[in-house]
């Protein structure tokens, strides 16, 4: 049994995966900002899901920079240099525990579930924050694993800010309320414009074959993708093609799939 944990800036999902590689027994709860409370809550939910049956691995995703099981920097949780892997291992001392960045896990899972992994795939998650990952030929390269596109500085409407401060899902919710199929066109136009502000330089720099959008906003990609593509076509140099823009499969659970993929990869390579 493989246990996966998607730690978000707002909520955390814990799930086990069955032999068909699908998540089951998904439990959702608000992410505690206190690290000790977070570890205790995750451990309790894992025990509840597994009923103390053997666990092959625990694979955890965190919303920030991760190094050797340590949450080096998770801005939306206020965590800095927190040894998440070590703390969790106190509850599961005989179980392999893998810790990784959430956008990396979601990006890897998204690209691997396309009919053919692209040469260069750019993944963006729009939720509590903005996360990015770059997947090359279906592989996540260690040298690119610390990409934090959401924190790049932008000049937006005459103000220096970060992409995350204008295009995170929480920002859209604060400004427009809950996005839905009934959201008016003018809102989707503004959503697309804000996403474009950060996506345009990333496309110019990486020139991906495809852009996959996940997170809470990714659910609605089909409502703004054409608008976004049009804005990019207007503003990118003619020599740079506008990549296809799609929603991640299972955008609100794709991190769990990535955690599963990472666990399988780690277990089979050791």
Q: What is the meaning of each model-derived region?
A:
Residues 1-57, 66-68, 88-97, 109-122, ...:
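ATP-binding/phosphotransfer module of carbohydrate and carboxylate kinases, centering on a glycine-rich
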Residues 6, 59-63, 100, 122-129, ...:
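Short beta-strand segments
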Residues 71-81:
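A charged helix-plus-loop insertion that forms the helical arch/lid used to bind
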Residues 80-91, 95, 103:
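Anion-binding (especially nucleotide phosphate/pyrophosphate-binding) glycine-rich loop
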Residues 104, 129, 218:
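Catalytic metal-binding/acid-base residues of hydrolase active sites
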Residues 136-137:
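A cytosolic small-molecule/anion-sensing beta-strand core signal
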């Amino acid at each position: 049994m493989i246990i996966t944990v998607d730690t978000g800036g707002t909520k955390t999902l814990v799930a086990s995966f069955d032999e068909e590689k699908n998540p089951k027994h998904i439990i959702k709860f608000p992410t505690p900002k206190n690290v000790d409370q977070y570890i205790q809550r995750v451990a309790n939910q894992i025990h509840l899901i597994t009923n103390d049956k053997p666990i092959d691995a625990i694979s955890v995703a965190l919303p920030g920079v991760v190094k050797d099981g340590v949450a080096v920097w998770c801005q939306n949780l206020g965590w800095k240099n927190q040894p998440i892997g070590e703390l969790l291992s106190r509850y599961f001392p005989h179980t392999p525990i893998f810790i990784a960045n959430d956008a990396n896990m979601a990006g890897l899972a998204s690209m691997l579930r396309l009919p053919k992994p692209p040469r260069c795939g750019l993944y963006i998650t729009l939720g509590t924050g903005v996360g990015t990952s770059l997947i090359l030929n279906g592989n996540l390269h260690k040298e690119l694993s610390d990409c934090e596109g959401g924190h790049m500085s932008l000049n937006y409407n005459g103000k220096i800010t970060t992409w995350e401060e204008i295009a995170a899902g929480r920002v859209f919710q604060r400004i427009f309320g809950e996005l839905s199929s009934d959201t008016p066109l003018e809102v989707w136009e503004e959503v697309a414009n804000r996403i474009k502000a950060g996506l345009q330089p990333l496309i110019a720099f990486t020139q991906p074959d495809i852009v996959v959008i996940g997170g809470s906003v990714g659910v609605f990609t089909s409502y703004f993708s054409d608008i976004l593509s049009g804005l990019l076509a207007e503003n990118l140099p003619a020599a740079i093609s506008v990549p296809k823009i799609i929603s991640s499969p299972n955008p609100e659970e794709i991190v769990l799939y990535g955690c599963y993929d990472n666990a399988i990869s780690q277990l089979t390579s050791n």
